[in-house]
């Protein structure tokens, strides 16, 4: 059973028993709502614990798919790079099925010499081994030798991923300015000018410029002796899908992790360019062993696995050894899960820009679950400044780290360290911190306030230190830490973070993320339209040259109708109609059902509807 599904089932089964025990709940996040939903309390500034449930594959709470094998490769004498790549290319050339899946390349147990980089460049392709253990009789071992510093496995199209590719603009439509004076943390809806320029299903960016007003509000970035942050350099931006447009109000598929104040920085939305994004790609059950000359060598592969410009991707059951930067690096990506994987024994000097075992860079809504890091500097880290947000680290372990897991620099937002376990602490001074949510001053290149609206929840620190500090205009939280939680970082000692329940066992819920996923998936009662949450997922693939699949979610049982309209507003096809229970459903239009052109899928339940555009190719 997939790991996330297992965790959700365990959480659901344990919930009644846990409620009956003598546990405790936070004063600002408590399961006291209807059906045990979490209730959040905001402070006087409007800060509150964020909602993280959309992190991970499929937007959170969705099991990873089991992709069928369509190509099999065994080890051979000499270099195996070409034979594995040929199999990957053969699968990439296949037509995707209705779910966008092409198939998996399965590497039989054995040792493979890989001098080059294995590249997954098309959607729906998976690279899978037999296991990530040490025994070539039962496991798949990729051995990289030589001085090639390129990644061993590269998922995505790096030539299209330069700069801030996750928020690349499509110039086809004008921007729409956000009207609200304040958009609160956790908001999914707000009003905009020119809302009629946009439609349900559009991929957009919510853009908050780094104005002089904002930089002043955050104390110039809190950079100590380094220069203040510069106007225009660090926009806060969120890649989102529009679920609905009703009058001036737009509704997003995931919440925001910063408070947008119009008088400080007028924010706006624009259409996102998703060219070269690939989806439904994964790396599974492999051991990547990078050979080096010594434990301080840096001539070998910088990273073991890199995902770049990927959505709805995953890394599962992979062990990476002896990289010098990252075992898994997720870059310019969204809705990715990395689970049950290990990034161990990096070989490098122990200094800056090295040993970031599990890393995100300019990525959003990413879930790391059940992983293990060893000998890191920054074991679990965000390295993409203001473009990192909605990053969840759940049930992970760090052994023998030399410094902290953290959002590393320049206003990463919405990081959650949920049931983190630290082993092998080297001290409890401010320089020995093992999780840090706060100010990094003049470390690096003016790192300053590295983290805003971030949470440590129920961490088991085993003698290591959590440092949490309050940034201007935001808050950071340490709730239920088993260990030492301090508000005194390496640069400041006078901030007022939220620290609660240190060394108090029995925090409920055990996992903030899993409870938030559960809450989101519960039926929504007493909405005026009687429907509750109604969501139409983006059609896939889009554009389509074959079958097109539509997904939708209902919060409660309802009569639903999914129809297809042409550009003249005429109904040209009916995908599905009838009663459906609560949950996620799919419908498929077969190849040839529609002529080439632009169409609109509209899901209707009573008087409420959601729509998404899609294109059919020849």
Stretches with model-predicted labels:
Residues 1-4, 618:
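Positively charged n-region of N-terminal signal peptides that target proteins for export
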Residues 6, 11, 16-294, 476-521:
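Extracellular "leader-to-stem" segments immediately downstream of a signal peptide or signal-anchor
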Residues 117-121, 134-169, 191, 271-276, ...:
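Glycine-rich beta-solenoid repeat tracts in large extracellular/virion proteins
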Residues 124, 129, 202, 210-239, 243-244, 279-369, ...:
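Right-handed parallel beta-helix
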Residues 172, 406-519:
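Extracellular beta-rich repeat passengers
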Residues 260-266, 326, 349, 379, ...:
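A short, polar/proline- and glycine-enriched secondary-structure boundary/capping micro-motif
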Residues 529-540, 544-618:
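C-terminal outer-membrane/trafficking sorting elements
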């Amino acid at each position: 059973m997939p790991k996330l599904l297992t965790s959700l089932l365990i959480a659901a089964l344990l919930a009644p028993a846990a409620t009956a025990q003598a546990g405790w709940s936070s004063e600002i996040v408590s399961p006291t709502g209807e059906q045990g939903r979490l209730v959040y309390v905001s402070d006087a500034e409007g800060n509150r614990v964020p909602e993280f449930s959309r992190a991970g594959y499929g937007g959170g709470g969705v099991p990873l798919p089991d992709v069928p094998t369509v190509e099999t490769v065994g080890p051979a004498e000499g270099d195996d790079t070409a034979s594995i790549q040929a199999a990957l290319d053969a699968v990439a050339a296949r037509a995707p099925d209705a779910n966008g899946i092409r198939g998996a390349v399965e590497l039989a147990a054995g040792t493979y010499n890989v001098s080059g980089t294995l590249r997954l460049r098309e959607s729906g392709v998976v690279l899978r081994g037999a296991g990530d253990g040490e025994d070539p009789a039962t496991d798949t071992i990729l051995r990289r030798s030589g001085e090639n510093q390129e990644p061993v496995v590269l998922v995505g199209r790096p030539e299209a991923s330069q700069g801030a590719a996750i928020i690349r603009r499509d110039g086809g439509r004008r921007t729409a300015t956000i009207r609200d004076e304040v958009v609160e943390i956790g908001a999914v809806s707000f009003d905009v000018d020119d809302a009629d320029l946009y439609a349900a299903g559009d991929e957009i960016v919510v853009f908050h410029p780094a104005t002089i007003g904002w930089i002043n509000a955050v104390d110039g970035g809190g950079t100590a002796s380094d220069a203040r942050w510069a106007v225009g350099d660090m926009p806060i931006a969120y890649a989102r899908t529009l679920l609905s447009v009703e009058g001036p109000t737009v509704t997003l598929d995931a919440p925001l992790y910063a408070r947008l104040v119009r008088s400080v920085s007028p924010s706006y939305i624009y259409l996102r360019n998703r060219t070269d994004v690939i989806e439904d790609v994964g790396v599974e059950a492999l051991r990547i062993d990078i050979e080096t000359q010594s434990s301080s060598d840096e001539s070998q592969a910088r990273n073991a696995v890199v995902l770049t410009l990927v959505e709805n991707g995953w890394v599962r059951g992979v062990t990476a050894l002896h990289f010098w930067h990252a075992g898994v690096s997720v870059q310019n990506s969204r809705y990715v899960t990395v689970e049950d994987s290990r990034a161990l024994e990096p070989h490098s000097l122990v200094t800056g820009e090295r040993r970031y075992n599990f890393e995100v860079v300019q990525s959003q809504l990413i879930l790391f679950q059940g992983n293990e890091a060893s000998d890191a500097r920054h074991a679990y880290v965000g390295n993409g400044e203001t473009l990192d947000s909605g990053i969840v680290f759940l049930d992970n372990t760090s052994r023998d780290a030399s410094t902290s897991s953290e959002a590393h620099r320049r206003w990463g937002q919405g990081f959650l360290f949920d049931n983190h376990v630290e082993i092998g602490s080297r001290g409890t001074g401010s320089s020995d911190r093992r999780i840090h949510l706060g100010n990094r001053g003049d470390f690096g290149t003016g790192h300053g306030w590295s983290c805003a609206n971030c949470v440590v929840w129920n961490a088991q620190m085993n003698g290591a230190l959590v440092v949490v500090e309050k940034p201007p205009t935001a808050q950071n939280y340490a709730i239920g830490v088993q260990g030492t939680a301090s508000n005194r970082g390496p640069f400041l000692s006078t901030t007022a973070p939220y620290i609660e329940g240190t060394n108090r066992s029995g925090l409920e819920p055990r996992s903030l993320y899993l409870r938030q996923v559960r809450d989101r998936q519960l039926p929504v009662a007493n909405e005026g339209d009687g429907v509750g949450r109604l969501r139409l997922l983006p059609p896939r693939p889009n554009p389509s040259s074959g079958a097109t699949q539509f997904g939708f979610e209902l919060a409660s049982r309802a009569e639903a109708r999914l129809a297809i309209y042409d550009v003249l507003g005429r109904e040209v096809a009916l995908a599905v109609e009838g009663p459906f229970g609560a949950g996620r459903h799919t419908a498929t239009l077969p190849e040839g059902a529609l002529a080439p052109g632009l169409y609109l899928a509209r899901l209707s339940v009573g008087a409420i509807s959601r729509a998404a555009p899609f294109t059919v190719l020849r």
